[in-house]
UniProtKB/Swiss-Prot annotation:
Name of this chain's protein: Acetyl-coenzyme A carboxylase carboxyl transferase subunit alpha
Cross-referenced SUPFAM superfamilies: ClpP/crotonase
Keywords tagged on the record: ATP-binding, Cytoplasm, Fatty acid biosynthesis, Fatty acid metabolism, Lipid biosynthesis, Lipid metabolism, Nucleotide-binding, Transferase
PANTHER family for the chain: ACETYL-COENZYME A CARBOXYLASE CARBOXYL TRANSFERASE SUBUNIT ALPHA (PTHR42853), ACETYL-COENZYME A CARBOXYLASE CARBOXYL TRANSFERASE SUBUNIT ALPHA, CHLOROPLASTIC (PTHR42853:SF3)
GO molecular function: acetyl-CoA carboxylase activity; ATP binding; carboxyl- or carbamoyltransferase activity
């Protein structure tokens, strides 16, 4: 199976394979088969629209985890200029599962922080599969407090299965690190915009997710537990993950209807990984617009607005 396509996309993958075969035949024999290729491309687009217009919550969860999906550093490369990565929590070590640093957006200084997964095996291990340890969250907190001192807005990118649950993380007080970030972010006197770009897994996501504006990409997810984890608890088997995903309401559109998410950012046809540059352009445009709006608020109004937003959850 083509790794660029998930199983429910297999009909699209088959058409793309035919298109590639025709291109190779045309190159080898100098034949003009552009009309047939164009016909198949139109058919592929129509089929993609049909499949992606009827995705289940579980299919969206799998898209959010797609191995080709853009990660935080990909968005930083496309959206910002003059990015300077900063390292370490000044307590224990540096955590590669969290990246952050200063940058410019539309020529204005900002602090960018996000979860980072890896592509290849060694990189995945180095990034701990996007699951931060306490030092990652403490690094993020250090950078956010720095941003407040220098009056820089904070932009976070959320993409994690969850905080790392290992013994070493618990020994260094994982829960305290997350809780401290929630406390600090609620009081920071600078605008905060969080964008869920893939998986928004529980407290591991929320630790950089307290904000004035919460965006979610169209095929991202945000939940207190993974569908597999929920299914294992409720039905004693991960095979019920699809049912759990539907019941939990983990998708951007569902969370927007509950007023938890402020903006759903549309993805290119087939998902963000089909056109990362276009996806980044969409995110960039929204961030600029939202920063302009939040930048007009004084600190008291900003904090009151943030408090009211958080207190409105569940009402």
């Amino acid at each position: 199976m083509n790794p660029n396509f998930l199983d429910f996309e297999q009909p699209i993958a088959d058409l793309q394979a035919k298109i590639e075969e025709l291109r190779l035949v045309g190159n080898d024999n100098s034949l003009n088969i552009s009309d047939e290729i164009a016909r198949l491309q139109d058919k592929s687009s129509t089929l993609t629209e049909s499949i992606f217009g009827n995705l289940t919550s579980w299919q969206i969860a799998r898209l959010a985890r797609h191995p080709r999906r853009p990660y935080t550093l990909d968005y930083i490369e496309h959206i910002f200029t003059e990015f300077e990565e900063l390292h370490g929590d000044r307590h224990f070590s540096d955590d590669a599962a969290i990246v952050g640093g200063t940058a410019r957006l539309n020529d204005k200084p900002v602090m960018v922080i996000g979860h980072q997964k890896g592509r290849e095996v060694r990189e995945k291990v180095r990034r701990n599969f996007g699951m931060p340890r306490p030092e990652g969250y403490r690094k993020a907190c250090r950078l956010m407090e720095m941003a407040e001192r220098f009056k820089m807005p904070i932009l976070t990118f959320i993409d994690t299965p969850g905080a790392y649950p290992g013994i070493d993380a618990e020994e260094r007080n994982q829960s305290e690190a997350i809780a401290w970030n929630l406390r600090v972010m609620a009081r920071l006197k600078t605008p905060i915009i969080a964008t869920v770009i893939g998986e928004g897994g529980s407290g591991g996501a929320l630790a950089i997710g307290v904000c004035d504006q919460l965006n979610m990409l169209q095929y991202s997810t945000y939940s207190v537990i993974s569908p597999e984890g929920c299914a294992s608890i409720l039905w004693k088997t991960a095979d019920k993950a699809a049912d759990a995903a539907e019941a939990m309401g983990i998708t951007a559109e569902r969370l927007k209807s509950l007023n938890i998410v402020d903006k759903v950012i549309q993805e290119p046809l087939g998902g963000a990984h089909r056109d990362p540059a276009k996806m980044a352009a969409n995110v960039r445009a929204d961030l600029i617009e939202q920063l302009d709006m939040l930048g007009k608020l004084d600190n008291d109004t900003l904090l009151k607005r943030r408090y009211d937003r958080l207190m409105s959850y569940g009402i």
